[in-house]
């Protein structure tokens, strides 16, 4: 440990002392930890345990299941004493967490059979370790710090699963200036997949969303005894259906507190303005369930719109806490539950429509009369969306019938005076009551401006189509549909990162949607005839059919004003067109949908838009949707991380514009830098007005936060990054060429190259998705770094990164600090087009081409593979296989696949036989040992000892022999695992 690291630790302990934590320097090992826990347990439960009782108690509560441990921590539990009598006990004071003993310990060592780790700082509540704090001196890469903890937790028999550390709820990582925290979880929710997602990690913030990152301030705001107790007891959610711990974000916590305080003080109504994609359901759930134990109120109703199907929200609520919400199958059930005194009926999820029927005096069933005893009770109504079409009609009825009721609403896009009246249907004005009129005041704001700054949602890149000709259309007017389609076909691959993502085309009406669908088919067929290499887009279309008295469709259409209006004209024509569209969908995707069961078709379309994560494993590429044509559907409330582009051929304004744009800006990783908008109606002014209205912040220029930089600015940064890389190479007396990277001396130089080129590639990834680059700009980008040079640099980057990653894996904590903190971001170097299937088909084509007509020779194909991160473990094998293919022998794709599988199997057998011979081991036994590791994805030290047993070596000689074998075997295991984690291997390498 360096002095400065030690100083950070001592300063933190001193700060916690100021916060009235007790420092326990005597607790440094497992024995002392357990003795302290025993003393606290006996004092809390007013009991003295015998040694055998304590041992049985400890063994019964220690578990490798984080979720079960979290429940044990929060519940009253039972234990049988030596004399057979039951002991009901708690681990901490669950009624008043502030009254627990809070202690801080440091440099704890927990030694188990396979694990010898030291932990910087731990916080104990009543002797139970609940928070681990890892301190660093270097600039913390949160992903690297997380990776380290994940690695520790994957060691078989680690301290986290075999000791009291199983009760850890939170991990905190800090380098004094930058502090992050995240929830503990079981392995399936604690995995680290640098390609697609990271563990949910958080920075704390104040109520006005100012970040609290300094460790000293963080300790004061977050680790104060009562605050930490609340964070763990009130603001962590145990998701029953997924057996997962969920930490609420700071803005969610403040919103819940605001509602609870407002009810406690009985100070009227209020609304929560939290932007789309910010997790409103979790916030409203927590508010509702905390009110369940609030004696100030009699009932809490969580009200959704029928279109959202209360079943869906109920399932979401019950996902957070099993059985917490009962189903109201009809209005009669709702009324019965409202009148019930049962604790289970205190929180009720219902629909606006059922609530309206219950309060309708004209209803024959006299619901309103039966509810009369509740008239003066304290009722709380929480509305999941303030401005559903049905809301206004019921608001007045609720206020009149329940004069003591308090109403709370959630919205991502409030209605202000300015947007209270706007065009909802082409040619018609619609009016809304403002959110302030309905709910009096805003209790908490977390706007899109906040969310973009927090990287919880992405910025937007808006490309306004510039029509040409003598009389171009004015802003707000459409252009010819054929021109729109030609533009989409030209720009789609750029906008969607080579079809890694997909798009929605928003049209002005149902007739437009039908026309677009038919025109897409016609134009793409023509292009296919002209060019056999043309790859058509998979186009789907979805709009609601004429209702014809169908209640399900009527419900769907309640918030689809344009579709409702359009279906009044020529309903049979609309129905026939939708039937053709669904038939085309069935033929394309092998489904069997009918418009009579429209909702099933609609759900399938949504699933195909969402299932885009893997090149072929969730859905084959041919089974994915590229563009979905819509009118009103999917433009509000629909979320997919793999939707990144919106094509707009309809007039949008204010909240309608923000809702539609927000479909594209869900965060994935650096391969999705922003949401792409291609607007064919030149709506610059409506965009500027919406940004000004919904920024929610008194800032000079919110558009700089909401919108990405101009292409010219990013090109300037790209040029500067390449120039910086060139200067770096010159300083090392090397020319700035890919092959020169291999001549860099020392890991420090290699690390600098990795960081510099990673920035080059990040900027290039951004530019690659700009759809509005002028020809001169494209030329300039290629001049800065030619495509061939870029590909070669990518290849050398991957080779260098692979070498440094091996040091990272092998040496762990002992690796140099700058190597430890490296984050390679391989996702920037993986093309969605170039997957395994694509490579196999390219190799097949290569063998089938005549020598004079080669579009891609062997070395070019190898270069393409070696510049893609997906093949980092197999790149050498694929290159060797391609070079070994016979000349002038045409092979189909199946032959290529089978040949490559044989090639790999034979090479693996040869390599293992060579290793076995060098170490005097039986080749078949070594093969079985390796196959077992790969099958289970777990490295088991006992199996290694069994493999060595026939050599009859003493302990010391056997240990040396094992280390020598694993030195050779580990790189091969990593390669054969193809990037998948092998539990226990990283820690084994680290301990060598």
Regions found by a protein language model. Give the residues of each.
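Conserved C-terminal RecA-like helicase domain
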Residues: 346, 476-630
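Loop/turn-to-beta-strand initiation segments
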Residues: 299, 344-347, 377-380, 404-408, ...
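Catalytic cores and motor modules of nucleic-acid processing enzymes
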Residues: 14, 42, 50, 268, ...
């Amino acid at each position: 440990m360096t002095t400065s690291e030690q100083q950070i630790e001592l300063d933190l302990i001193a700060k916690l002392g100021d916060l009235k934590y007790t420092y326990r320097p005597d607790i440094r090992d497992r024995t002392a930890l357990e003795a302290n826990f025993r003393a606290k347990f006996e004092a809390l439960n007013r009991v003295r345990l015998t040694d055998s009782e304590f041992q049985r108690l400890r063994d019964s509560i220690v578990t490798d299941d984080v979720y079960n441990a979290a429940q044990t921590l929060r519940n009253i539990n039972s234990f049988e004493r030596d004399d057979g009598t039951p002991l009901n006990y708690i681990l901490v004071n669950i009624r008043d967490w502030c009254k627990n003993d809070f202690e801080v310990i440091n440099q704890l060592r927990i030694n188990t059979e396979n694990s010898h780790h030291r932990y910087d700082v731990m916080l104990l509540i009543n002797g139970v370790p609940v928070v681990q704090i890892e301190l660093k001196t270097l600039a913390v890469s949160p992903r690297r710090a997380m990776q380290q903890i994940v690695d520790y937790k994957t060691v078989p028999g680690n301290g986290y699963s075999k000791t009291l550390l199983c009760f850890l709820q939170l991990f905190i990582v800090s380098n004094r200036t930058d502090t992050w925290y995240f929830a503990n979880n079981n392995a399936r929710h604690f995995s680290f997949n640098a390609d697609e997602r990271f563990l949910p990690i958080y920075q704390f913030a104040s109520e006005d969303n100012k970040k609290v990152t300094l460790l000293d301030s963080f300790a004061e705001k977050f680790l104060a005894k009562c605050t930490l107790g609340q964070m763990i007891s009130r603001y962590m959610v145990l998701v029953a259906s997924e057996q997962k711990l969920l930490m609420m974000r700071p803005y969610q916590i403040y919103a819940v507190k605001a509602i609870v305080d407002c009810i406690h003080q009985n100070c009227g109504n209020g609304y929560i303005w939290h932007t789309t994609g910010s997790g409103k359901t979790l916030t409203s759930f927590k508010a509702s369930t905390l009110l369940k134990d609030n004696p100030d109120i009699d009932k809490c109703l969580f009200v959704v719109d029928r279109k959202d199907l209360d079943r869906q929200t109920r399932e979401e609520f019950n996902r957070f806490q099993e059985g917490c919400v009962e189903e109201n199958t009809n209005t009669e059930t709702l009324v019965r539950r409202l009148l019930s005194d049962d604790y289970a009926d205190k929180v009720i999820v219902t629909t606006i429509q059922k609530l309206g029927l219950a309060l309708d005096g004209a209803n024959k069933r006299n619901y309103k009369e039966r509810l009369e005893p509740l008239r003066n009770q304290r009722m709380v109504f929480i509305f999941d969306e303030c401005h559903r079409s049905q809301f206004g009609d019921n608001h007045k009825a609720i206020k009149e019938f329940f004069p003591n009721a308090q109403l709370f609403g959630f919205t991502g896009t409030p209605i202000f005076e300015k947007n209270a009246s706007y065009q909802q249907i082409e040619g018609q004005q619609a009016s809304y009551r403002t959110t302030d009129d309905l709910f009096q005041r805003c209790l908490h704001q977390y706007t899109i401006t906040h969310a973009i700054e927090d990287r919880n949602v992405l910025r937007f890149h808006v490309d306004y189509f510039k029509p040409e000709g003598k009389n171009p259309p004015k802003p707000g007017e459409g252009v010819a549909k054929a021109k729109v389609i030609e533009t989409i076909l030209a720009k789609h691959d750029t906008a969607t990162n080579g079809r890694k993502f997909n798009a929605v085309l928003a049209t002005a009406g149902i007739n437009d949607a039908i026309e677009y669908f038919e025109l897409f088919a016609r134009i793409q067929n023509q292009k296919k005839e002209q060019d056999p290499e043309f790859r058509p887009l998979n186009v789907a279309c979805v709009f609601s059919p004429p209702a014809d008295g169908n209640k399900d469709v009527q419900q769907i259409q309640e918030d689809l004003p344009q579709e409702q209006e359009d279906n009044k004209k020529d309903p049979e024509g609309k129905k026939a067109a939708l039937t053709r569209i669904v038939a085309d969908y069935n033929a394309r995707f092998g489904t069997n949908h009918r418009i009579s069961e429209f909702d099933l078709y609609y759900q399938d379309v949504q699933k195909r838009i969402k299932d885009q994560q893997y090149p072929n494993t969730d859905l084959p590429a041919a089974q994915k949707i590229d563009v979905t044509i819509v009118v009103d559907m999917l433009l509000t409330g629909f979320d997919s991380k793999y939707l990144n582009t919106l094509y707009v051929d309809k007039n949008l304004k204010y909240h309608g514009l923000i809702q539609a744009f927000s479909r594209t800006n869900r965060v994935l990783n650096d391969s999705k830098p922003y949401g792409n908008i291609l607007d064919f109606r030149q709506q610059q002014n409506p965009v500027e007005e919406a940004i000004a209205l919904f920024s929610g912040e008194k800032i000079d220029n919110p558009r700089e936060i909401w919108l990405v930089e101009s292409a010219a600015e990013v090109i300037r940064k790209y040029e500067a990054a390449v120039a910086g890389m060139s200067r770096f190479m010159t300083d090392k007396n090397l020319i700035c060429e890919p092959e020169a990277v291999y001549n860099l001396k020392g890991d420090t130089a290699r690390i600098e190259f990795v960081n510099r080129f990673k920035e080059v590639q990040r900027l290039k990834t951004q530019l690659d998705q700009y759809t509005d680059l002028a020809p001169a700009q494209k030329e300039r980008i290629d001049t800065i770094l030619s495509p061939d040079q870029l590909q070669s640099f990518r290849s050398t980057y991957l080779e260098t990164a692979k070498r440094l990653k091996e040091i990272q894996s092998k040496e762990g904590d002992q690796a140099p600090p700058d190597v430890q903190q490296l984050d390679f971001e391989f996702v920037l170097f993986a093309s969605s087009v170039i997957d395994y299937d694509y490579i196999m088909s390219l190799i097949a084509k290569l063998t089938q081409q005549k020598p004079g007509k080669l579009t891609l020779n062997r070395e070019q194909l190898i270069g393409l593979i070696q510049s893609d991160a997906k093949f980092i473990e197999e790149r050498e094998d694929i290159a060797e296989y391609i070079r070994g293919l016979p000349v002038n022998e045409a092979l189909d794709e199946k032959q290529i696949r089978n040949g490559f599988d044989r090639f790999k199997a034979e090479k693996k057998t040869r390599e293992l036989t060579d290793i076995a011979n060098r170490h005097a081991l039986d080749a078949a036994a070594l093969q079985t040992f390796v196959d077992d590791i790969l099958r289970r994805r777990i490295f088991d030290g006992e199996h290694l000892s069994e493999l060595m047993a026939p050599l009859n070596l003493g302990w010391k000689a056997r240990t040396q022999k094992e280390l020598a074998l694993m030195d050779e075997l580990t790189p091969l295991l990593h390669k054969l695992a193809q990037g998948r984690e092998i539990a226990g291997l990283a820690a084994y390498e680290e301990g060598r």
